[in-house]
A protein has these predicted regions:
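Von Willebrand factor A/integrin I-like adhesion domains
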Residues: 134-196
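P-loop NTP-binding core
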Residues: 88-90, 112, 193
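Von Willebrand factor
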Residues: 1-45, 53-94, 97-101, 126-140, 151-165
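Short beta-strand-loop
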Residues: 28-58, 138-144
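Switch/connector loops and helix/strand junctions flanking conserved nucleotide-binding motifs
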Residues: 2-3, 41-45, 107-110, 136-142, ...
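VWA/integrin I-like adhesion module and closely mimicked acidic/polar interface patches used
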Residues: 86, 104-143
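Short, well-ordered amphipathic alpha-helices
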Residues: 13-21, 74-84, 113-116
Length: 196
């Protein structure tokens, strides 16, 4: 992802942050973390309280592999080490929400397939995967989650609509660890296609 698409992702992340910061409920309960994945896996924003987030500028190499499986493995390790589970003696974290955005297919298919059951065992409040552009394969993402959307065009408007929808989804699907809840999402805008 280069040029306008990655710039649109950065602008979209800013709009997501702005929308969440206007929600007093989110200010009290949302933490953000961002991983990037290409030939390297980077946690470019470690888990940070919403009010303390300073977004990094996301950049991508000109070409190379898409180590989605390795990123999911890193994510599993991070969630397992950082999530506070509720108990009689302490209040737990809210169930995490995973938003995955990719413009390609996993280069590490075996690692991706092995990471899927681990991700599913973490009891995410919701997992939303977005296949952005013609090189992304929604069917591969359907192995990870039933909530897969696609963006046919990777322009500023499409990404803006996607991130607005994500911010509404975060507000709607945050539920406490251990609580059962519906993972129904708000309807997406026209620029976002639900993959069945």
């Amino acid at each position: 992802m280069k040029g306008e698409p990655i710039e649109a992702v950065n602008v979209g992340l800013q709009s997501l942050l702005s929308a969440l910061r206007q929600n007093p409920y989110a200010l009290d309960s949302v933490y953000l973390s961002i991983f990037t994945f290409d030939s390297e896996i980077k946690n470019v924003l470690p888990l940070t309280a919403l009010e303390d987030v300073t977004l990094p500028i996301i950049s991508t190499p000109d070409s190379g592999p898409t180590f989605l499986g390795k990123m999911l493995e890193e994510l599993v390790n991070t969630v397992q080490s950082e999530q506070i589970l509720g108990s009689i003696n302490q209040k737990g974290d809210w169930r995490p929400i995973l938003i995955l955005l990719t413009d390609g297919k996993p280069s590490d298919v075996m690692a991706y397939n092995n990471a899927i059951p681990q991700i599913k065992s973490l009891n995410f409040g919701n997992i939303v995967a977005c296949a952005a552009g013609p090189k992304a394969d929604p069917n591969v993402l359907k192995k990870l989650t039933n909530t897969v959307v696609s963006l046919d065009t990777m322009d500023s408007n499409s990404f803006a609509q996607f991130f607005q929808w994500v911010s509404a989804s975060v507000a709607q699907t945050s539920v406490s660890v251990g609580a059962s809840a519906s993972n129904t999402l708000p309807p997406p805008p026209n620029e976002i296609n639900i993959v069945f």
